[in-house]
Amino acid sequence: MSDTDGKKPLGLGGGSRSGQVKQSFSHGRTKSVLVETKRKRVVVPKPGASGSSTTTSSPSHLGDPAKRPAGISDAEMERRLAALRAAKLREVEDAKRRADEERQREEERQRRREELEAKEREERERAEALRQKAEDEERARREAEEATRRAEEAKRAPAPAAPQPAPAESRASAPPSAKPGLPPSRKEREREADRDRTTKKDDSRRSGKLTLNEALSGEGGRTRSLAAMKRKQEKARQKAMGFGHKAEKQVRDVQLPETILVQELANRMAERAADVVKALMKMGMMVTMNQSIDADTAELVIEEFGHRAVRVSDADVEHVIDTVEDKAEDLQPRPPIITIMGHVDHGKTSLLDAIRKTSVVSGEAGGITQHIGAYQVKTESGAVLTFLDTPGHAAFTSMRARGAQVTDIVVLVVAADDAVMPQTVEAIKHAKAAKVPMIVAINKIDKPDADPNKVRTDLLQHEVIVEKMSGDVLDVEVSAKTGLGLDELLENIALQAEILDLRANPSRQAQGAVIEAKLDVGRGPVATVLVQYGTLKRGDIFVVGQQWGKVRALINDKGERVDEAGPSVPVEVLGLNGTPEAGDVLNVVETEAQAREIADYREKAARDKRAAAGAATTLEQLMAKAKADADVAELPVVIKADVQGSAEAIVQALEKVGNDEVRVRVLHYGVGAITETDITLAEASQAAVIGFNVRANASARQAANQKSVEIRYYSVIYDLVDDVKKAASGLLKAEVREHFIGYAQIKEVFRITGVGNVAGCIVTEGVARRSAGVRLLRDNVVIHEGTLKTLKRFKDEVKEVQSGQECGMAFERYEDIRPGDVIEIFEREEVQRKLA
């Protein structure tokens, strides 16, 4: 048997290969690459068919009609030829485009490679320069030290020998590996091989992509990544430049509001939130990143981390309000603002009606002013005056205070037949507090019992000295009914205004004071504003208290629509988003965003203030407050009024109603009609709803009937306060009064089975009744107080026993009675109390 039996002949085709190559990367990663071998199929022509196969591939054969395949027309053949030519043309263009792209990529790679090499070369040169500089400095230092040492040796030895080159120095100057006559050691050979291997790896890294030949041959295996190379170069550069030391910590200015989240504080300091939480825990505060801390604590944390705290306040949003002082050349004369003040029924509104030649007082409920009014009057001389009419009732203290704050001149109206009254004194105090000049108008001079001198004398008690009493306060005797003295009053007002020299800048952004505010059914929130500075125009965006808005319309005191209102002009402003508080200041701002931001801040501040005022700080205070509330009876009410000032006056008046045992609690007060929401609130708290010059709508009336909620309407504040006082008086505990009706003397004590000890008595004074209370006196000391169990005369049970008669008495649950004791007999009466 031959050696080749059963074996296949050897050939160049090779065995079957898997077609996969493993590609190695850095960090021990590998990747399998699938290698595809492109094969071309070679068709071997049959014998005798070589000529035909050769001509078939040529285009001339396709165009030859004699040798064309059957069933193909000339047009179809032309289309095929055109498609074939276009395909060949596309192949040529694609090949050219690929070649261009490959060339561009190669150029880009070459450019990047050159840039990287240039950068590395530059870094090496810089590092070499720094190293050379350091070596030169070190060499200079050594030479200086050597020179110093030689000088010292020269001083010690006058004739030194000629210096010979020290063999140790020559050996030290040579590199450690350069040992003459000795071959390199094994460690040096390994170090040199490692250096060559590293250089080879770096070169292979720059050589570009991994090729198929390298992958098949196993070369170019694990190499360092480009990021690692960049890190290495950056470290070398920083080390050469001397940046290896730790960078100095940056000190930041941290904006610190009133409260701040822990996470936000960490972000502003550029510190880790966990470190901030840890610092707070060291201070004894167990907080998380999402909790807020106060500004003082945050400032301590900022200082601990080495930063600077810059305090900012939420109130900074109000800095957009224009508070610039006006220049003297921009100021122009403005009308004076005169406030009419005085006691109720002294004729303030009647006097103003006489000046305006109108009849406002006839339309006032009860003949008294309950709103603050603003009017403009043009005198016969052409002067324009702005008048504010304030209520005189005691409940309208805040209204009078607001009138005094915005006024230039106060006209104090005093009735000649009534002299100085409590609200007159209050008006004097308001005028003095506002530091405004005063003119005394002695009204009702036409009455028979008028006594102007008594008014002047009474004013002396309050440090108001009129001119006729050698003082500096102007006084005028007037009569609103007959018109006497009105011209003199207007002349004095004009004279006082001329002395004050009132001026304002009409060109700046408007600022004014809210005199009155109300909620109109058809027009929405309406505010009566007295413009103090600038000019208020239609379309202006403004903020007033906790509300903001855009001026939709301006209405003057005559009910006419105007486009603008200058200084000292009272107007009604429409376009608010809510009803402001009377006394708030109106400021015009640039944008709606600013107005909304300021209003939101003010609302939040007011809410926090209310919460802080009503909150108990300690458990003891909370318990004491709860106990005090439990001992006080409350009368809950809901107040709705036509204007904001009236609502405030009612609330202030009701807060004064009550004592230590009962008080009035205003659950809610507002302006506008009574709504179903008010009824729901009243039902939940078992309160009454009070409407002052307003009415309930249909749904509110229906809800009140269903839920049995009482609604009361008033138009005069006197009646309202009196009725609430009566209702609050009903919550007071009745006062128990005792009336002594008789005395009885115990003569003998009997023991009766089933009854106990029975006292045999004689009524010495008054009468003894079965239903009355009794006290047992022994030696004029009360030893028992109770009621009678039985009252008998002889053997009959009786209701009462008259004086001088004998009877038998037994006490309820008490038997310690002795002969000689005295029984005091009395009756209790409950008397209903009333609030003062």
UniProtKB/Swiss-Prot annotation:
GO cellular component, one term: cytosol
Region (G4): 443-446
Region annotation G3: where it falls in the sequence: 389-392
Keyword Protein biosynthesis tagged: yes
Residue spans of biased composition, Low complexity class: 50-60, 167-176
Ranges of Basic and acidic residues composition bias in the record: 88-156, 185-206
Keyword Membrane assigned: no
Residue ranges annotated for the tr-type G domain, each copy included: 333-501
Short name of any one Pfam family annotated for the protein: IF2_N
Disulfide pattern: none
Chain residue ranges for the region called G2: 367-371
Sequence segments annotated as region (G1): 342-349
Superkingdom of source: Bacteria
Family: Belongs to the TRAFAC class translation factor GTPase superfamily. Classic translation factor GTPase family. IF-2 subfamily.
Entry function: One of the essential components for the initiation of protein synthesis. Protects formylmethionyl-tRNA from spontaneous hydrolysis and promotes its binding to the 30S ribosomal subunits. Also involved in the hydrolysis of GTP during the formation of the 70S ribosomal complex.
Protein name per UniProt: Translation initiation factor IF-2
